Amino acid sequence: MMELPLCGRGLILSLIFLLLKLSAAEIPLSVQQVPTIVKQSYVQVAFPFDEYFQIECEAKGNPEPIFSWTKDDKPFDLSDPRIIAANNSGTFKIPNEGHISHFQGKYRCFASNRLGTAVSEEIEFIVPGVPKFPKEKIEPIDVEEGDSIVLPCNPPKGLPPLHIYWMNIELEHIEQDERVYMSQRGDLYFANVEENDSRNDYCCFAAFPKLRTIVQKMPMKLTVNSSNSIKQRKPKLLLPPAQMGSLSAKTVLKGDTLLLECFAEGLPTPHIQWSKPGSELPEGRATIEVHEKTLKIENISYQDRGNYRCTANNLLGKASHDFHVTVEEPPRWKKKPQSAVYSTGSSGILLCEAEGEPQPTIKWRLNGLPIEKHPFPGDFMFPREISFTNLLPNHTGVYQCEASNIHGTILANANIDVIDVIPLIKTKNEENYATVVGYSAFLHCEYFASPKATVVWEVADETHPLEGDRYHTHENGTLEIYRTTEEDAGSYSCWVDNAMGKAVITANLDIRNATKLRVSPKNPRIPKSHVLELYCESQCDSHLKHSLKLSWSKDGEAFEMNGTEDGRIVIDGAYLTISNITAEDQGVYSCSAQTSLDSTSEKTQVTVLGVPDPPGNLHLSERQNRSVRLSWEAGDDHNSKISEYIVEFEGNREEPGKWEELTRVQGEETDVVLSLAPYVRYQFRVTAVNEVGRSHASLPSDHHETPPAAPDKNPQNIRVQASQPKEMIIKWEPLKSMEQNGPGLEYKVSWKPQGAPEEWEEEIVTNHTLRVMTPTVYAPYDVKVQAINQLGSSPDPQPVTLYSGEDYPSTAPVIQRVDVMNSTLVKVTWSSIPKETVHGLLRGYQINWWKTKSLLDGRTHPKEVNILRFSGQRNSGMVPSLDPFSEFHLTVLAYNSKGAGPESEPYIFQTPEGVPEQPSFLKVIKVDKDTATLSWGLPKKLNGNLTGYLLQYQIINDTYELGELNEINVTTPSKSSWHLSNLNSTTKYKFYLRACTSRGCGKPISEEGATLGEGSKGIRKITEGVNVTQKIHPVEVLVPGAEHIVHLMTKNWGDNDSIFQDVIETRGREYAGLYDDISTQGWFIGLMCAIALLTLILLTICFVKRNRGGKYSVKEKEDLHPDPEVQSAKDETFGEYSDSDEKPLKGSLRSLNRNMQPTESADSLVEYGEGDQSIFNEDGSFIGAYTGAKEKGSVESNGSSTATFPLRA
């Protein structure tokens, strides 16, 4: 080969590197190529417990490679029957059978085809022997006390690592210290022996962990003879041994650990010190171990070269030794030769540089043979590179670069393939890709081509290449589309073209919508101990939902999906819940979404609020008699601004330890001037307030005591209390402890008649009340109360007006007239009593009245006094709620704070007639197809002479729509029934009945009923009802031979619906004999039991359904219609009234409403009752006559009966 001048090599190198960069690509196996070793063994140890030992060598190539081996640079036969070789592979196994030590050596694998040969790195196969100590007889060792001694170990050779232990027969370790030391070779050194060192079982054990073997040296006996004269001596080095002098050399490989040892004998025991002359020991990597006997430096580097010194000292002197450390290094690659693919006629370069200490030598090989045997004209070879010009196919081969020094050899293969082929696209055609809007899309077009090819991407079915700054074609053929949009979706074509031809594939791109997140609430501020719930709302493309995964993190640290801290932090999909939140939970929380195509995250700042820390460092300054300045330092506000400070004090002599609020200060301030009261020993504390709450109080300040002074203020709330006439008990609010200003507090009370020229009467008291007797009743007095103490009195107070005690009024009002407003309301007018007879402050007037008799029947009424009071100065009032058509007595009296005075003379008046109450009941007792008979009862209160009744009726349908209202005047007051004719058949009617007097008609009572169809018989009245709780009830009042209808009803139904009915015929005595024994028949007993069970089930169902409808009060409905006569008097002012027992007045206010809603027809059971109710018990069960009955088995819950059927008489 020729050498090239240095001036031209730079340009060639640049060109060659460019060609390498463009040409270096993995060759598809379908293209012919030289072999490449893809797998190999390095060091193989034959451990005795393995079944076999495998030495690997795998390679690829086209044509398929064949394999051969060398052992210790000599051919190795793979057909040896003692090994097992794999087919089409260079790997072989050595069975662990018998002696395999002859297989130990260094192997190389060669993979060859017709284009070249690849060579593996050296593979060492180690067959370790079984380490053993030699059988020997060790003579006992006798030494004098204080002498030094070395017990040799001489461990056998074996597979590293080697661990040495000194123990006795009981396997107890020989302890090491400054005096006793085991060297790296395993020898046991004694700087000086002692009597207790004597023993006959010193044993050296050698352990080989990789071989799982421990071997023991024969025990040694050491006898230490005691000496009466032990001589001290200065140190003498045993390690390193004396024959090495004061300086020794040590070589260590870079990156390894340097271990230096030093041991000296002497008495007293020498102490070892380590140093590096002219420098410091490497910090962080140098350690001194084993009682200062060894210096250890890890990861040694070239900077660690130089001298290291160990010095042994005792009282008598010292000894030292220097170690000259040299750092060397086995070969390592600086520039490793790279495989490359070239086309015919191109140029190339192979670089190979290695580093090491000593500097490695470089050797080149071609297909495993020295390259000098295969020169090519025009090529140039240098120690570290080979340059090719005008490459031809016969340049194809495997080039090996081998770097060697005394510490090892490394070898690298570089494949040079000179190929001319049309482009081969390795990416599949019609590959589908997807990305999201805004992300980059990568469409792959991996290819192999030689010579170099150009790649052009086009939109499918278009002939021009993609252009623009959003499109970029990478060197490997991949098209990258930046910032994709929905319009980028579609098909693309990749064209690969070189001098040998062209190839094309199509790629399809789909654009998905980007995933979006929204975390709520945004940047929440939450008080400590509350619950925080974050929700991560996500929007994801429908094609990506299957791959969507949400995760939560805090300050960049991910949460576990199953929650943490015993459930305090719980993650449930999109929800993150933190219970009992603490200050440590504050931070930036992030919700992250990951799909198969994109990822995004959304953050929210969680701020945890807490009450402030207490203020600190309270300080008092500017101390004055009545003021002091208090300052403090603010505590941490825990993310919530301090709004104010509360300053409290403690100094109450009566209640020590009680803190009271003194003032409040804005949150921006940290000091305040406090106004103080005299004669108080103050101590202050401060509390901070923010929106979360109050802090704990600060530590108390120093004490500040103010001097005493006269009182500043007088008692407040001066008032009088009197239980007797002419008495005046004066009371006031006493001064608080903080208001007394000094010791010896008393009160000076002064009084005199108001407007009188007399001198003030005075009395000094210590409590807060004073009783004074005056000469007159209810006279005004000027009263003053002044505070005094030992230092003076308070400012002169302003007098207040108080009155002496009252007496009862002494005269009665005179009733001037009583005006009857209507049948229940009168107006009373009276004259006021003279002011001088009130004997106090007039509170008002009181009317007493009572009913004496009824004008309807003339019967007298027992006296029941009613009371009505009118406050203030007035001379008239209204008396409501009187009984109509009655006679009353009425009196008036005055009252003050003491009580009521004498009554006036009784005034007698009468109330006129009123309208009656509603009839007591209204029943339809019989109906036919066009007639109906109604029956009613008298009103409970007639309120006058009854003149007759007003009967009204109208048609109603199932929806309760009302027809035309018909009226009939019943002018006979004594009449209690009426027969209606000319009614429509099979029609439902609603009937209304009012009782009337000369004043008009009263409130109506209503009832519903329905006429029958053609051929039906009328409904008769229910003649008997019983309240039963048993399943069977005998009825003995039925007429023999007659038909009867039996109804079974619940007692709390208000519309008389029956839940069961049947028609029965009673039999006479002539039939009795036919059924005498029927009750004893078994089938009859079973039938009765079945009927009883069915009845019980029906009753239970009906009770449940009925109770679901709720309850209502008839009285509440009646109260909705007040009496029209009372309504007109509401404009007058009524007083407070009660009877003699202070109970409310009896009676209720009602009115007539002719436009009643249909639902008002369902009244209480009492409204359905007839005059004779003796056949019913207190429950009201089976009350009244029925207007109709439900169809058999039907039950409705709206409270009205709409269907009827006939009774069979």
Curated annotation (Swiss-Prot):
Residues 26-1083 are extracellular. A motif (DGEA) lies at residues 555-558. Its main location: membrane. The keyword Manganese does not apply. Disruption phenotype: Mice exhibit misguided axonal projections and aberrant axonal connectivity. They show alterations of hippocampal fiber organization and olfactory axon projections. Their exploratory behavior in novel environments is altered suggesting deficits in information processing and in attention. They also display signs of decreased stress and are more sociable and less aggressive. Heterozygous mice exhibit half levels of CHL1 expression in the hippocampus compared to their wild-type littermates, reflecting a gene dosage effect. GO terms for biological process: adult locomotory behavior; axon guidance; axon regeneration; cell adhesion; cognition; exploration behavior; negative regulation of neuron apoptotic process; neuron migration. It is found in: Cell membrane. Disulfide bonds join C57-C109, C153-C204, C262-C310, C352-C401, C445-C494, C536-C591. Expressed in the brain, in the cerebellum and in the spinal cord. Detected in the retina and the optic nerve. Expressed in neurons and glial cells in the central nervous system and by Schwann cells in the peripheral nervous system. Residues 1115-1133 have a biased composition (Basic and acidic residues). Residues 1-25 form the signal peptide. Residues 1150-1162 have a biased composition (Polar residues). A motif (FIG[AQ]Y) lies at residues 1182-1186. The record marks P753, Q754, P1040, G1041 as: Cleavage. Residues 1105-1209 are cytoplasmic. Gene3D superfamilies: Immunoglobulins (2.60.40.10). Pfam families: Bravo_FIGEY (PF13882), fn3 (PF00041), I-set (PF07679), Ig_2 (PF13895), Ig_3 (PF13927). GO terms for cellular component: apical part of cell; dendrite; extracellular region; plasma membrane. The modification Phosphoserine is found at S1148, S1161, S1181. SMART domains: FN3, IG, IGc2. Residues 696-717, 1115-1170 are annotated as: Disordered. The FIG[AQ]Y motif seems to be an ankyrin recruitment region. PANTHER family: NEURAL CELL ADHESION MOLECULE L1-LIKE PROTEIN ISOFORM X1 (PTHR44170:SF45), PROTEIN SIDEKICK (PTHR44170). This is Neural cell adhesion molecule L1-like protein. It comes from Mus musculus (Mouse). The lineage of its organism: Eukaryota, Metazoa, Chordata, Craniata, Vertebrata. The gene is Chl1.
